[in-house]
Amino acid sequence: MAHKYQYTCEGTIRIKREDEDFTTFVYVETNLYEATIQEATEWFEGMLSKYAACYGIDSKFSQVGFEVTSVQQKD
């Protein structure tokens, strides 16, 4: 079994309602234990996309998107 490192992952989910002029940002931070930074980034990106999809099924939101902003290995 490969050694797993701890990574701190940060990202945002952008949501906008149809009748509003501004975008709301949801900040997400978590710690993951993965073998490589690529695996941590892919896992976190998948998690953010699923979380954003929850907003996407609500018809009140006209625009939904997400972005991984940081993945860093902790010491």
Segments the model singles out, each with a brief description of its role:
Residues 2-26:
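Short aromatic-glycine-(Arg/Gly/Cys) micro-motifs in beta-strand/loop hairpins
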Residues 3-5, 25, 31, 49, ...:
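Intrinsically disordered, low-complexity segments enriched in small/polar residues
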Residues 33-58:
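A short, charged, amphipathic alpha-helix used as a generic interaction element across diverse proteins
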Residues 11-13, 40-48, 64-66:
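Amphipathic alpha-helical segments in structured regions that serve as interaction surfaces
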Residues 49-75:
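Short, mixed-charge low-complexity intrinsically disordered segments
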